[in-house]
Structure formats: structure tokens, C-alpha cells
């Protein structure tokens, strides 16, 4: 198996128990739902939306084996394995590979600000060398608003040139289409076997036209079916469907994204345990829940009227 299939991915939210530990079985069932009925071609657990940096190392190390035991599709799961500690990133990446999940999403080391390009290069080079597996497929994780550690385009090109297929692509969470296009243009995008994934489904058609591979988004936890409807439509129906995608994305952006996606899953599943957040994040307030519920009802009414 090589790289992950292209398409629409959800940056999956994570369910926590009362003690703050991740509930692996519940996460697996949820990811299965996303791919079977939730409109997703794949899932990216333990990323930002999944509160990955708030999950213990022991839980993160155990997840890939649990996914493998549940026979989750190896080419449709991209585990977040980043850590500021190079050794921890190596261990997490090895755990994914040992379970048959070759595709990983790697944040840059984000604690020390303004690292040099050489320092960032060294971080990824050491991970690749210490993991020592040609089957590894790394998706660089560009999220400058949160990590405060952007990937210069020239560095991405250098990593791809030096490590070939191991540097499989990049998730661009900048929210800036011009930035996503710059990464695709510099690497050749899908034609150059470098898969760029913007983080907003609102730009899905522009992204695909620019040579990107799909979308990895937090709001596709709830709205991926709308994206698939737009992709399968044509003519005026496509324009209408894309507008529905944009409205849904704008609705999600009105709220703390992780808390909102968890609240939506709690409503869908009838399981309020989904609203648990890892500190410092908190669940939606009662006022936010009421507003979100009203916004979702309005979205559903608009969708029904358009059918």
C-alpha cells in the first residue's frame, strides 16, 4: 500500500472518557460512520480538530493498533503523529507504520518560534532517518495560525526533492487559497504526485482545479455529504450545492469548531459524552448550543427547499 486515497477527509473529533482518556472503540465506530454514511472518503484522527496534542502519548501510541484490529482501511486513515519532541514523533510514526497505516500528518516542532529552514529540515530528516521505512508517507501540516511555524514553499520543495515519495503531500490549514495553490504549483500537485489538501471545503472546486488532491477539514465531521453532493452535481445544480457548502462552512466558523462538531455528533448519536473537551478547550455554552441548533435547523430548511 502506498499513499492515502484522494478526496474529502474529516479531521475527526475525539471522544474522551471521564478521566480524559481517549475512547478508542467509540472513535473507531465514529470514523467508520464518517466513511460509510457521513460523506467522507477518509479520516484524519488525532489532528488539531481531534485535540491530538491534548491526548496522552500512551493513548496515541495505542490507537493505530486498535484501528488495525478493527480492520479500518489502511489507505483511508491519516494519523496525526506530530510532536515537538522528535523522539515522540518517531515513536508515534513507527506505531502507525507497525499497524499498517503508512500515511501520517506531521506538524512542525512548534514550541520554539521562528526556527530556521535548516532547523525544520533537520527535524523531518531525522524523523525519516530514524523511522527507516520506505513505505512511510508524510503529509506536512501547515497551520501557521496555530503552530506559528509556517512551511516556506522552498523548504517543501527541498524536502520533496530529497526524500521523494516519503514526502507525500501537505495539509494547508492557512485558509488562504493562494497559499494552497502556491504549494501545488511549486511541487506539481497531483500531477507531480504531491497531494495538497486545503482545510476549507468552501474552496473545493478551486482547489481541485489548481491541482490539489481534496480537502481535509474539521467541519466535514458534519457537512461532508454536502461536499459530495456538490461534487456529483453539474450546471446550476452544482452552483446551488456549492453555495450550500459555503453556507454550512460559514455556520461552523461562527462557533469554536471542535466544540461545535462534538456537539453536533452528540445530537446525532444521542450521546452527550461526545461534548467532553480536553482542557483548555471547553464545551459550547447553553447560549451557543441554542444558537447552533437554530442555525442547523435553518440549514436543513434551506436544503429541503432547494430539493
Where does each model-flagged region fall?
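A structural signal for short hydrophobic/aromatic patches embedded in well-ordered alpha helices
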Residues: 63, 123, 159, 241, ...
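A general structural signal for well-ordered alpha-helical segments in protein cores
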Residues: 27, 60, 64, 89, ...
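Catalytic alpha/beta core domains of metabolic enzymes, predominantly
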Residues: 132-135, 144-255
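Short secondary-structure transition/capping segments
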Residues: 55, 116-119, 209, 227-230, ...
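C-terminal alpha-helical cap/extension of soluble enzyme domains
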Residues: 4-14, 33-40, 212, 219-307
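Glycine-centered loop/turn motif at secondary-structure junctions
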Residues: 38-39, 100, 163, 191, ...
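Active-site beta->alpha loop and helix N-cap motifs at the rims of alpha/beta catalytic domains
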Residues: 2-150
Amino acid at each position: 500500500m502506498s499513499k492515502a486515497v484522494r478526496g474529502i477527509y474529516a479531521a475527526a473529533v475525539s471522544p474522551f472518557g471521564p478521566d480524559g482518556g481517549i475512547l478508542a472503540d467509540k472513535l473507531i465506530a465514529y470514523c467508520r460512520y464518517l466513511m460509510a454514511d457521513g460523506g467522507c472518503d477518509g479520516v484524519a484522527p488525532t489532528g488539531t480538530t481531534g485535540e491530538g496534542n491534548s491526548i496522552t502519548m500512551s493513548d496515541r501510541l495505542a490507537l493505530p493498533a486498535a484501528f488495525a484490529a478493527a480492520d479500518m482501511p489502511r489507505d483511508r486513515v491519516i494519523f496525526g503523529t506530530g510532536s515537538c519532541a522528535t523522539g515522540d514523533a518517531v515513536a508515534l510514526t513507527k506505531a502507525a507504520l507497525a499497524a499498517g497505516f503508512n500515511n501520517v500528518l506531521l506538524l512542525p516542532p512548534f514550541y520554539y518560534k521562528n526556527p530556521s529552514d535548516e532547523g525544520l529540515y533537520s527535524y523531518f530528516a531525522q524523523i525519516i532517518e530514524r523511522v527507516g521505512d520506505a513505505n512511510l508517507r508524510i503529509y506536512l501540516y501547515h497551520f501557521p495560525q496555530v503552530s506559528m511555524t509556517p512551511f516556506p514553499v522552498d523548504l517543501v520543495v527541498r524536502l520533496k526533492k530529497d526524500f521523494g515519495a516519503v514526502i507525500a503531500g501537505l495539509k494547508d490549514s492557512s485558509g488562504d487559497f493562494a497559499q494552497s495553490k502556491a504549494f501545488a504549483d511549486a511541487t506539481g500537485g497531483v500531477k507531480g504526485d504531491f497531494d495538497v489538501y486545503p482545510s476549507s471545503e468552501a474552496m473545493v472546486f478551486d482547489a481541485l482545479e489548481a491541482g490539489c488532491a481534496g480537502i481535509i477539514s474539521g467541519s466535514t465531521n458534519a457537512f461532508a455529504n454536502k461536499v459530495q453532493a456538490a461534487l456529483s452535481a453539474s450546471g446550476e445544480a452544482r452552483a446551488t450545492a456549492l453555495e450550500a457548502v459555503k453556507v454550512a462552512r460559514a455556520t461552523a466558523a461562527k462557533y469554536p469548531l471542535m466544540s461545535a462538531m462534538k456537539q453536533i455528533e452528540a445530537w446525532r448519536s444521542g450521546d452527550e459524552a461526545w461534548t467532553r473537551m480536553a482542557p483548555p478547550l471547553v464545551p459550547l455554552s447553553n447560549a451557543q448550543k441554542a444558537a447552533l441548533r437554530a442555525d442547523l435547523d435553518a440549514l436543513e430548511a434551506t436544503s429541503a427547499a432547494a430539493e
